[in-house]
Amino acid sequence: MAIVLDGNSLTIEKLEAIARHGEKVELDKDALERIKVCRAMLEEKIQAREIMYGVNTGIGEFSEVVLTDEQVKDFQKYLIYNHAAGIGDPAPVEYVRGAMAGRINVHARGHSGCRPEITLTLVEMLNKGVTPVVCQKGSVGACGDLAPMAQMALCMMGEGESFYQGKRMPTREAMAEAGIAIPGLQARDGLATINGSNLLTAMSALHLYDIDSWLKQAEIACAMSLEALMANLKPYDVRLHQLRGFPGAVRSSRAIMKCIEGSDLLSGKMKTKVQDAYSMRSSPQVIGAAHDAVAWAKAQVETELNGVGDNPVFLPEDKLTLTGANFQGSPVSLPMDMVGAAVTMVSVMSERRMNRLNNPALSVGLPAFLTKGAGMFSGLMLSQYTADSLIVEQRILSMPASIQSIPAAADQEDFVSMGMNTAIKNGQILDNAYGVLGIEFMAAAQALDFRDFKPGKGVQTAHKIIRKYVEFLDVDRPLYPDHTRMKELVKSGEILEEVEDVVGPLG
């Protein structure tokens, strides 16, 4: 069944299904009527020669320039030509499909003033698999993602390039092969297609979807390391975290203990320390803080997905045009900067647990670097180097982009969100985080093979999955294939899926 876009109910999960899995979309009937009513009001105002930003005026610094009737006809075309000014490699198809769905949902609110044909063409392109080729770099996150969205708007004129059936081709050819009519651009249509933070918001939504899975796997990896290090398990008692009251920590402690359930460590017969190091016993607080950051970001992103991110906006019921800055990406870029830092923070803690597994002074009886032949063999010594390299890069990328505004457009646009930079770097942070967590998983599995007690059911399951892809390190071998396989394993979510089948949902 198609996902209905009505301007009010687009979730991160629905957007992920549209962007990645080709779910069909349908424009809500009431939404289509709202679009028609808004357009009719706009055309009345055009006939009455009411001055409206971006309709019969220039844009940015030229907003005080009033266009003639003849200029209005061609203005949208030249606006899009001028704004299609990005650079670099094309954004992944899933990001662009997400942005298209987001823009349709903005129009569905009935305040953008474009012709219905524009919105319906975007719907048809999504459903038939025509995806604009969009340079990922060039947006400053206000007025929205102008440069990349302008490449989407080129398609409304049959210009630019698109991906169709796995091939990159001129948009006019793609539209013809898919049987999609080219609507052209009339007054307001171009600006109504580009003037919002839809690409950075779609990217952020997909990152949040993936980070939720990654954080759950961080809890599984943590549980494995805790067992391998023979941790005192009192710090993971959910009652401790309920007393403080942070929902993320409560959730995280519960997830960790689910993975450890059934372990010999819970019998009370094994000797453990009175208190372990912070990288062990404060794991629920740290991973939990990341969960709480993600929860805030998710609320912000879903508000943006269902909000009127546009300028100007039109209120048909009041016969009113309002100009403002609803394109400003800060409500998304600020929480997403925090999410990027949160992923890096959890990665740092993952590496610290791996360090304890490797270090014979800290590992409670494990061999140095988790190898049987210390001296002749170096075990997982260099795996830690790799994790450290990734984390340094994550730390650099965790500098907030939302505070990096550079004034532009003759200082008319003198504060911008830089939200696209946030979105791009968060993708890089998460990619590194898959590698860091994969290395902790590999080290924890190696360490558990040196222990002679029974771990928890969730930990046993994770260990079994890891051993499908990476063998026990008996003697030294090149480890880069193992690191790569572990990174891809974490990215796939297979460990999480199998563990949840055994212990129940970790969310």
Residue ranges and their predicted role:
Residues A2-E13, A19-R49, L79-V134, L226:
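Glycine-rich, flexible loop motifs
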Residues A2-E23, L27-R34, C38-I46, C155-G507:
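C-terminal auxiliary extensions adjacent to catalytic cores
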Residues I35, M52-V55, T68, V72-K73, ...:
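Generic structural signal for well-ordered secondary structure
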Residues E50, V65, S252:
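Polyanion/phosphate-binding surface patch
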Residues Y53-F75, H83-N105, V133-M157, E173, ...:
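FAD-binding core of FAD-dependent oxidoreductases
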Residues V65, A85-D89, A108-S112, I287, ...:
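Short gly/ser-rich anion-binding loops that grip negatively charged ligand groups
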Residues D69-A84, R356-A368:
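Catalytic or ion-translocation cores adjacent to nucleophile or general acid/base/metal-coordination motifs
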Residues H107-C114, K137-V140, G144-D145, M203-L206, ...:
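Short, well-structured alpha-helical patches and their helix-loop capping segments
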